[in-house]
Amino acid sequence: MAIELSEQEQLRRQSLTALRNLGIEPYPAARYEVTATAREIADNYDDAKKNFQDVRIAGRIMSRRIMGSASFFELQDHTGRIQVYIRRDDICPEGDPTLYNTVFKKLLDIGDFIGVEGFAFHTNTGELSVHCRKFTVLSKSIRPLPVVKEKDGKTFDAFTDPEVRYRQRYLDLIVNPQVKETFVRRARIMATMREFFNERGYIEVETPILQPIPGGASARPFITHHNSLDIDLYLRIATELYLKKLIVGGFDGVYEFGKNFRNEGMDRTHNPEFTCMEIYVAYKDYLWMMEFTEQMLERVAMAVNGTTELTIDGKPISFKAPFRRLTMTDTIREKTGYDITGRSEEELREACKQLNVEVDETFGKGKLIDAIFGQYCEEELIQPTFITDYPREMSPLCKRHRSNPDLTERFELFVNGKELCNAYSELNDPIDQLERFQEQLRLSEKGDDEAMFIDMDFVRALEYGMPTCSGMGIGIDRLTMFMTDQSSIQDVLFFPQMRPEKKVVNDPAEAYTAIGVPEEWVPVIQKMGYLTVESLRKLAPGKFFNDLCGFNKKNKLGLKAPSIDEVKGWCDAN
């Protein structure tokens, strides 16, 4: 009793065999030369010019209307869909109707890839179509696609379950074509940024992902082991220190688009693996970098959306430069009435208590201030806003402020209540840098597992001399969320990190036979999706009886049907 596959899966495998029996290879090795796309035909076809009279298109069959000796189907390629008109007499000129009557009508299915040779025309109803002279099977789909129906502008049976969409992104891209546009725009964001940097003579570089010391940010790293060297290594949490070593080495400006990894929480705006762009430019400071960042984001918005005026989470947000600038101290004072200037760790801890900000004993001054800011200020920063001049304890890699040594020359850009980028006038004093690293070590000893490691090679590089330099890092995933108005980071990642799929444990056959289910019916019931005896108790006996009989008949199982009373007994069993 073979019922491991659904009826559709069985039929498609039978079609696969039938194609081969007819001498048609369902997965041919030869290339198929495509001469036009659906969009090119839609954008450029002209009845008067009679262009596209000899085209070869290829794609996936997405719908069919079979009408005797002539039919229509929709072909979807990477640019969109186009209707194809196919007629038996055109593709079966020798009088043998097999190619149309058997192959097209019976052995091809929605989801199959085919190539079509023909010419473009408008049907009597004005629908742009390709008249098929010849088709070639390119790939047989043996698993049916979800069928999304549209009628009168309404969508039915849409493929919208986020859990399934993220796990099976390939399927999401097939049946939800608007999803592809998000990723096309993501690529445009990165291309525009590269163009912006390259025009200014900055060099794109690559730095190690496996690092002996995870530096450049305060975060918990992933740890791995190199068997040959017998050493632990870390997946990088930032590219910063290696890029600054290149500035030491004489590059005037370098940037990198790279994957970073942080072994921390997952939510709608955080994924443990994420894409970040970092850029470092010699002889610049954080004031210059603010203007540079404004110009870059203004250009990205125009390239991706054609305007700097966007809507994010229903709120109008403008990326037109210049952006607002506020100091962190003033922002906290404005929102809480508390002045963090010159406060000790004990005073800040007491302030957190008074302000009902949750902290723990491992927090130093920097994290205490960050906790206050995060709870009271971030969500209020809707329009693009530079928060500047952070307390020194929050920024171990940043240069002291030129007019206040308790502050640093740092800014973060906030948009829609979220941090988008982080930038410094980079610390280039090797003695000061070592002292900052040592302070991070003290925080680590207190239990702060996000404190920075001491990187003595980086200190050594600074000892050779690094020019005045400004650096900026920006999260590409979050930028894409803003530019495409997506509320979840999973919607801008092709394959976001997911928790393991929950595996439902089937009840043993004995549990079913104990309530009267015949042994031969147990695998059938479980194949129908009722994996536990408990699941039967939630069913309406009459409907379940009809479903059982229908499944038995459809799959030609030949089992003796139970009576309605027997089925009622299974559902009512305690």
Language-model features: locations:
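Class II aminoacyl-tRNA synthetase catalytic cores and aaRS-like
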Residues: 1-504
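Compact, charge-rich alpha-helical regulatory domains located at protein termini
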Residues: 501-574
